[in-house]
Regions:
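Active-site-adjacent segment of SDR/Rossmann-fold oxidoreductases
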Residues: 13, 32, 53-65
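Active-site loop immediately N-terminal to the catalytic Tyr-X3-Lys motif
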Residues: 34-38
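Active-site helix of classical SDR
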Residues: 7, 43
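SDR active-site lid
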Residues: 57-119, 131
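Residue(s) in the substrate-gating loop at a strand-loop-helix junction
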Residues: 27
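Conserved internal alpha-helix in NAD(P)-dependent oxidoreductase domains
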Residues: 1-2, 19-20, 45
């Protein structure tokens, strides 16, 4: 994918300089199954796993290059307005999410999860069996489709 290729291209140059930071943008969706939106959830999971793998490689190489993953919930964007996308969680302000991401990235945080409701959702996903998370996700997506 283009995401993978661009990350690797920039990473190669950063590693040569032993300096730099990559901020990959995923989603809370990257931590859970997503029936009825499988492709979206899978692409976000890919970004999470790619970033986790690169992070481990950088650690083993003792590189000073940093990588972070932004994993927000719904973010208010013009795309959502035009596409008439509806969410179950409150949409976060895009500028606030961006500022938060930069602040946490500069602090060296790896997983960047803005918003208490999204942090709670991520914690719940860790605790619950995947089969239950999948059923909950299905119901949430099904309700969105019916709106």
């Amino acid at each position: 994918t283009a995401y993978h290729i661009l990350t690797k291209l920039y990473l190669t140059e950063m590693k040569k300089k032993n300096s730099g930071t990559i901020l990959n943008v995923a989603s809370i969706a990257g931590f859970m199954p997503g029936p009825l939106m499988a492709t979206y959830y899978a692409t976000k999971a890919y970004i999470v796993r790619l970033s986790e793998s690169i992070r481990e490689e950088l650690k083993k190489e003792k590189s000073k290059v940093q990588i972070s993953i932004l994993c927000p919930g719904p973010v208010a964007t013009n795309f959502n307005k035009v596409a008439n996308v509806k969410f179950h969680l409150r949409e976060a302000d895009s500028k606030k999410v961006a500022k938060y991401a930069i602040k946490k990235m500069e602090q060296g945080k790896f997983y960047i999860v803005p918003g208490i409701d999204v942090k709670i959702a991520r914690f719940g996903v860790k605790l619950l069996p995947t089969s239950l998370v999948s059923k909950i996700s299905y119901k949430m997506q099904e309700r969105k489709i019916k709106k």
